[in-house]
Amino acid sequence: MEADCRKDADTLPGSPAGGEARAAQVLRLAVYAGETLLENGGEIFRVQDTMERIARAYGQAGFHVYVLTNGLFACVDGGQQLGTSLRFIPQAATHLGRIMAVNALSRAIAAGEVELEDAFGRIEQIRAMPSKRAAVRTLACGVGSACFAYLFGGSWVDAAAALAVGLALEPLRIVLERARAGKFVSNLLGAGLVAAVSLLCAQLLGALGAACSLDKIIIGGIIPLVPGIALTTGIRDVAGGDYLSGTIRAIDAVLVAVAIACGVGFVLKVGALIPGVTV
């Protein structure tokens, strides 16, 4: 995560030596791993469990951590001094590859296969893992939209139209992601674009005499916007007893759903006012 997105407060008074220096290093490593998991979409229980396993593996029994959906608090008793760390971690995007890599690293650390100094280098490599290229993301969005339009009862014509919708949607999402637009605004604009392109495709296909279903095209197009990961992660957090984080994620999913509904509804309402346009 970029420096201007991180607000932290690490405190270890004085000049730690011996066991205190090691405790400080373990604290930083555990927080670094937890930060990587959380900002890439990891569940709360997974973040906390991973951090505790890393601390125990390096002999820090006095390690404690409290994790929320967008931040974590950790401390370790290094003997005469108490090290603490606070991180504000807004989630940028889900990256399952990084989550899997951190999980594999934590298991290797727990098995005693990774030295403390080497672990920092491994974490840096994980954080440097690239995201998918824009072209790949755009193609995946288009194909996914087409497949879901067909799965929800649409025809091959509907699937082809949904493919065009998906290919138009992902570039907008990438631009809004780079501009750091809010999640509500991004999904509102994305849903509006889906409805507009779907309506345009339906009118063009109708003019060509091809039968199509506008609702199936829209359904396929909005599937990439549906907050499935946030919803399932929230349920997992609640099942694990973390009701606060689970509720926050559930509220986040509801707000995204509202944004999608508002975006689609507004465009369809405007489209219905245009003479000659059938909604």
What are these regions (language model features)?
Residues 1-26, 128-132, 261-279:
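N-terminal charge/polar-biased segments
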Residues 125-126, 169-182, 230-245:
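C-terminal ends of transmembrane helices
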Residues 1-114:
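Soluble N-terminal domains of membrane-associated systems
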Residues 200-279:
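Generic detector of multi-pass transmembrane helix bundles and their immediately adjacent loops
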Residues 131-205, 213:
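Core alpha-helical transmembrane segments of integral membrane proteins
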Residues 91-143, 149, 153, 253-261:
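Alpha-helical transmembrane segments and their cytosolic membrane-interface
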